[in-house]
Amino acid sequence: MIQQETRLKVADNSGAREVLTIKVLGGSGRKTANIGDVIVCTVKQATPGGVVKKGEVVKAVIVRTKSGARRNDGSYISFDENACVIIRDDKSPRGTRIFGPVARELRDNNYMKIVSLAPEVL
């Protein structure tokens, strides 16, 4: 579960390497976010020459969490790190590549471009 002030790795080539969560979108009193939820972040580390600069406020969708997620068949999936992909307002990724596996829950939330770019969907 991701909450305010959580730092996440960025799993795309948009230029950001690490982001800090500012807000969890989806309701006035919402505290935590899981895989497939949208968050507002600020870029804490960025690579030189990237599309996204340090200090920029961006929207991102969570693709991997350490706490994991429960599926409808009763199974759980969890990852070694918390990671996100920076997106535009139309849910398309700002980068052109996705690094590492992503969860199948993104397909249910209509992030088809991220699912198609990912090397592995678990």
Swiss-Prot record:
InterPro entries: Ribosomal_uL14, Ribosomal_uL14_bac-type, Ribosomal_uL14_CS, Ribosomal_uL14_sf. Binds to 23S rRNA. Forms part of two intersubunit bridges in the 70S ribosome. CDD domains: Ribosomal_uL14. The keyword Transit peptide does not apply. One of its GO terms (cellular component) is cytosolic large ribosomal subunit. The keyword Ribonucleoprotein applies. Belongs to the universal ribosomal protein uL14 family. Part of the 50S ribosomal subunit. Forms a cluster with proteins L3 and L19. In the 70S ribosome, L14 and L19 interact and together make contacts with the 16S rRNA in bridges B5 and B8. It comes from Bacillus pumilus (strain SAFR-032). This is Large ribosomal subunit protein uL14. One of its GO terms (biological process) is translation. The lineage of its organism: Bacteria, Bacillati, Bacillota, Bacilli, Bacillales.
